[in-house]
C-alpha cells in the first residue's frame, strides 16, 4: 500500500531515511509517500541544495523498491522502454505529459523564498526545462528509480507500466 503524505519527516522517519540512504539526508523538504507501515518511500527535495539546482524533486528512498527497480534496470528494461517511446506516439505523448506533471509539481511546491532564490541564481530555465530526475531529453528514459518515485507521487506513465508489467508495487507491505 502507498500513501501520499507530503509531510515534514518526524525524528523516527529521519532515522529510517538516514539508514535507507546510508547518510543523513540533505535538502529534504517532506516525506512524499510512505508504505502501509509508515516507512518512507519517497522524499520531496528542495529545488536548491548547497546553492545548486537539485534535479530530483522526488527521491526514492525505500531500500526494497530500489532493489526491485535495480533488477529491472539490469535486465535491459530502459532500452525496451526507449524503443517503445520511439515506436508508440501515444506512449511518447503520455511520457511527455509525465515530464510536464513533474515540472509543474516542482514549481507548485516551491515557496516564494525558494522561487526568489532560483531566479537570483539564474536557474529558472533549468528547473523549467529539465524533467523527471533532471533529464533534458524528454524522449529518453534515464533512471527508473526517479520515474517510479514520481509515479508514487504524481502521474508517471513509466511507473504505471512498471506496476502493470512487473508488479513493482506488490513488493510493499
Question: Model-predicted segments: where are they?
Answer:
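An exposed acidic His-Trp-rich patch
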Residues: 65-122
Amino acid at each position: 500500500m502507498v500513501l501520499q503524505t507530503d509531510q515534514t519527516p518526524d525524528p523516527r522517519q529521519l532515522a529510517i531515511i538516514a539508514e535507507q540512504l546510508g547518510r543523513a539526508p540533505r535538502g529534504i523538504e517532506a516525506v512524499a509517500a510512505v508504505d502501509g507501515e509508515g516507512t518512507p518511500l519517497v522524499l520531496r527535495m528542495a529545488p536548491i541544495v548547497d546553492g545548486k539546482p537539485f534535479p530530483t524533486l522526488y527521491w526514492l528512498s525505500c531500500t526494497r523498491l530500489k532493489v526491485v527497480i535495480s533488477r529491472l534496470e539490469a535486465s535491459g528494461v530502459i532500452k525496451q522502454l526507449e524503443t517503445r517511446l520511439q515506436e508508440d506516439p501515444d506512449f511518447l505523448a503520455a511520457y511527455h505529459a509525465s515530464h510536464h506533471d513533474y515540472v509543474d509539481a516542482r514549481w507548485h511546491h516551491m515557496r516564494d523564498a525558494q522561487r526568489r532564490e532560483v531566479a537570483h541564481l539564474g536557474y529558472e530555465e533549468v528547473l523549467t526545462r529539465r524533467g523527471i530526475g533532471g533529464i533534458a531529453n524528454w524522449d529518453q528514459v534515464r533512471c527508473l528509480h526517479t520515474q517510479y518515485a514520481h509515479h508514487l507521487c504524481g502521474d508517471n506513465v513509466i511507473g504505471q507500466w512498471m506496476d502493470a508489467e512487473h508488479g513493482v508495487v506488490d513488493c510493499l507491505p
